[in-house]
Amino acid sequence: MSISASMVKTLRERTGAGMMDCKQALEEANGDMEKAIDWLRQRGLSKASKKAGRATTEGLIGCQVLPGSTSAVLVEVMCETDFVSRDEVFKKFVDDIVSQLVANFHNNDVDLLDQPSGNKNLSIRDLLNETIATIGENIVIGRSIKMELTPGKNGMIGHYVHTNGKIAVLVELATETKETASSPKFQELAKNIAMQIAATAPLALNSESLDPLKIDREREVYRQKALEEGKPENMIEKIVEGAVKKYLKEVCLLDQPYIRDDKLSIAELIKKVSNEIGEPISIIEFVRIQLGEE
């Protein structure tokens, strides 16, 4: 397969590897981008892990938690420059979109752009076009997310938005009683876990909920890397399993060290607060979005 300059450029942007290394990786992978990334990682040539999560698109993520903290919304709105993302007109537009999502929380049948804005004479689409004309930059409404407390459960939706508005998190915590769900200690736990998710970008709650194919892919990368480094044959499986264990500790929320006290894992933190409160606490789900990420 012929390897184009644009393919090399894309791989270089995704991994940070050298141009010739990217070209060789694509040739070895017969043009398959994901296999080329693995080829680079196996040889220690990829810087993708350092670049993961870096989003270049400007804009803001709007967030609003409804009264009682039993539901919340996030919406990603992108623009072209950081200057516009700090403009009051743009910020008001983001607030209007969030308010519309809240007002129509249970209405999933009508496209967001076709819903009325705060100005009843304008749809969201009209308001978008009007804001683009006012600001002079293209604006794109990206992902919108709604999270609601699981029916029949007591708990709350914790949230955290990074101060620059580029990362936002929602997390559902459950407990036994409404009294506990409204207690300061429970609410503080929800906030701290949301901050943890924002800072560490976990891929799953635990290893059981992580895609097995992703674990298999990591295992194969570590195995090939060990072979490339000439590790003893009888040590390779032990090295691979150690690397996989470390990987799971990094990407599974419950296994991660707590950012405010790394002597505790998140699972241990939850158990500690559960014991203090006298009721079991569990994380049901979470979502983390970073501006411009796919």
Curated annotation (Swiss-Prot):
Entry keyword annotation includes Protein biosynthesis: yes
Region of interest (Involved in Mg(2+) ion dislocation from EF-Tu), ranges: 81-84
Superkingdom assignment: Bacteria
Function, as annotated: Associates with the EF-Tu.GDP complex and induces the exchange of GDP to GTP. It remains bound to the aminoacyl-tRNA.EF-Tu.GTP complex up to the GTP hydrolysis stage on the ribosome.
One term under GO cellular component: cytoplasm
Keyword Cytoplasm: yes
HAMAP family (UniProt xref): EF_Ts
Cellular location(s): Cytoplasm
Source organism of the structure: Lawsonia intracellularis (strain PHE/MN1-00)
One Pfam family here: EF_TS
Keywords associated with the record: Cytoplasm, Elongation factor, Protein biosynthesis
Protein name per its UniProtKB record: Elongation factor Ts
Lineage: Bacteria, Pseudomonadati, Thermodesulfobacteriota, Desulfovibrionia, Desulfovibrionales
Gene Ontology MF term list: translation elongation factor activity
Primary residence: cytoplasm
InterPro entries linked to this entry: EF-Ts_dimer_sf (IPR036402), Transl_elong_EFTs/EF1B (IPR001816), Transl_elong_EFTs/EF1B_dimer (IPR014039), Transl_elong_Ts_CS (IPR018101), UBA-like_sf (IPR009060)
Similarity comment: family membership: Belongs to the EF-Ts family.
